[in-house]
C-alpha cells in the first residue's frame, strides 16, 4: 500500500505471484520485490505462531531440519539474523533460486541452484507456494504439509502426499504421524 497505494487485504491475496495479486507492472513488481527484501523489512516480519517451538522440538528429537527459501541470495544475512533472533540458530538456512530470478553467480555455501537442491533427500517438507510444488515432487515419497494461505486455497495438489495444514500444531501432528510410519 505504501509503494503504490494499492490495498489488498491479506485474506484476498489470491496468488503467490504478487505481481498478479496486486495487478502490478513489471517495474512496480521489481520495486516491490526490492522493498520486500530490504533487511529492515525482513527483520520486521512477525513469526507465525508455533513455528520456532515446533522446529526446535524436531531438532531436539534428533531430526535433521533445513530451512530452504526462494528468497533472493542477497537476503541471506537478514534472514539468518531473523531466524537467530527467533531461536532457530541451530537450523541451517539455504536460499535456492527456485524462481529463476538470480542473474549473478553467487558462490556462497548457503546459496544453491535447483540442481543442488534436487541432489538432496527429504522425507518431509512444508510449503505454501503452489509454484514450488513441482520442486518438492523431486523428492520421492516426501510428505508435504501445505501451509494454508489465501494464495494456495484454490491450488490442486499434485498427489496424496500433499496435505493442507492450517497451523503449526497441524503441521507437527502430520509430521509425527509420518515420522512414526517411516521410522
Language-model features, listed with the residues they occupy:
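Substrate-recognition "cap/lid" segment bordering the active-site pocket of phosphatases
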Residues: 73-126, 130-137
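Short, acidic loop-to-helix structural element flanking the phosphoryl-transfer center
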Residues: 38-66, 73-79
Amino acid at each position: 500500500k505504501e509503494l503504490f497505494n494499492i490495498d489488498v487485504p491479506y485474506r484476498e491475496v489470491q496468488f503467490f505471484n504478487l505481481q498478479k495479486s496486486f495487478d502490478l507492472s513489471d517495474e512496480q513488481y521489481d520495486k516491490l520485490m526490492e522493498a520486500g527484501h530490504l533487511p529492515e523489512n525482513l527483520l520486521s516480519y512477525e513469526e507465525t505462531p508455533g513455528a520456532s517451538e515446533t522446529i526446535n522440538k524436531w531438532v531436539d528429537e534428533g531430526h535433521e531440519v533445513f530451512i530452504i527459501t526462494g528468497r533472493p541470495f542477497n537476503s541471506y544475512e537478514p534472514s539468518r539474523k531473523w531466524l537467530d533472533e527467533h531461536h532457530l540458530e541451530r537450523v541451517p538456512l539455504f536460499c535456492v533460486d527456485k524462481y529463476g530470478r538470480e542473474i549473478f553467480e553467487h558462490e556462497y555455501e548457503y546459496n544453491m541452484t535447483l540442481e543442488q537442491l534436487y541432489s538432496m533427500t527429504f522425507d518431509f517438507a512444508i510449503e505454501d507456494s503452489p509454484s514450488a510444488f513441482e520442486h518438492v515432487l523431486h523428492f520421492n515419497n516426501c510428505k508435504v504439509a501445505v501451509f494454508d494461505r489465501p494464495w494456495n486455497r484454490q491450488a490442486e495438489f499434485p498427489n496424496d502426499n500433499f496435505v493442507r495444514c492450517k497451523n503449526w500444531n497441524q503441521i507437527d501432528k502430520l509430521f509425527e504421524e509420518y515420522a512414526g510410519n517411516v521410522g
